[in-house]
Amino acid sequence: MAIDFPSEISALRTTYASIREVSDLDALRKELADLNDEAAAPSLWDDPEHAQTVTSRLSAVQAELDRIEKMGGRIDDLEVLVELSEDEHDADSLAEAETELNEVKEQLAQLEVRTLLSGEYDSREAIVTIRSEAGGVDAADFAEMLMRMYLRWAERRGYKSEVYDTSYAEEAGIKSATFKVAAPYAYGTLSVEQGTHRLVRISPFDNQGRRQTSFAGVEVLPVVAETDHVDVPENEVRVDVYRSSGPGGQSVNTTDSAVRLTHLPTGIVVTCQNEKSQLQNKAAAMRVLQAKLLEKARKDRQAELDALKGDDSGSWGNQMRSYVLHPYQMVKDLRTNYEVGNTSSIFDGEIDSFLEAGIRWRKQGES
């Protein structure tokens, strides 16, 4: 069936116009100009932490503007390609136009989803923690599978990731792991993954080959910015140091470089052992602790509102996705009902369709 290119391109232009309106390009350009002025100040690097915040935000705003404005050019180029192909009755060029149309539609959909990320912290980088829950060794193995899935997703997108801490289980898998995804809007995107994930499969660890159901929890936090003013007094934190350990509990470091921070008022505990020095591990652990305290404050505020409304739907312990490998293969989001049969691709990080569905579902719930 022949593609109705004029209708398709008209739909693209309508969506693109809506994206430009929602994105408020004038405000982005003004912010970019202000950031450029601040970045050019000779005194910028007198405060390295503030300088890094400015340069990171500058890069993010510039990338956002480029992404939106270049999309308009791609739609224009597509229209020209279609006109030339139809005038010359060139089948190869029309096939090329069809390929380009599909690519533009996919990227425009991703851009449209980005406009839905308007929450207070959505533009931040993300700190992800995965914990094995019920299910014994299978749960630990599942937690490691999820960790790899998210790291592969970040790799596929060209995002930098940094593993802060990994607590290995004795037989296989991990008890828990914490890592950062350093990319604009990583928090807004990955926060829809928060909750309990369920795996159903024939256990590779069961001698009788029985089916096993196991669970793992995913927590996603925004990286704290200096503007959040999350101050942690030294007298409220106990610092313990120990040797880093690997799979099976084996020591992987001959010095006490791993760090455990305990926030005494709340009891929150954070560990970091993957950096090279104790100082680096302490700094990374403090970033995670600040993120957890920021999230605790947000949840406390939300709990007050939920108590007034009688709403307890915000619990991150709710099951949100099932991964079934036996007796059939299916990954299904229990909130959106979106499902995919190619389970291997999902575990290899191809989760954009789930993320998009989750973001749209969340936005609908807010409206």
From Swiss-Prot:
Pfam families, A to Z: PCRF, RF-1
User: Where is this protein found?
Assistant: Cytoplasm
GO cellular component terms, alphabetically, are: cytoplasm
Maturation and modification: Methylated by PrmC. Methylation increases the termination efficiency of RF2.
The record, for Gene3D superfamilies, names: 3.30.160.20, 3.30.70.1660, Release factor
Coarsely, its chief localization is cytoplasm
- Please name the PROSITE patterns in this protein's record: RF_PROK_I
The UniProt keyword set, sorted, is: Cytoplasm, Methylation, Protein biosynthesis
Positions carrying N5-methylglutamine are 250
Output the NCBIfam families linked to this UniProt entry: prfB
Describe the task this protein carries out.
Peptide chain release factor 2 directs the termination of translation in response to the peptide chain termination codons UGA and UAA.
The name on file for this protein is Peptide chain release factor 2
| Native source organism of the sequence | Kineococcus radiotolerans (strain ATCC BAA-149 / DSM 14245 / SRS30216)
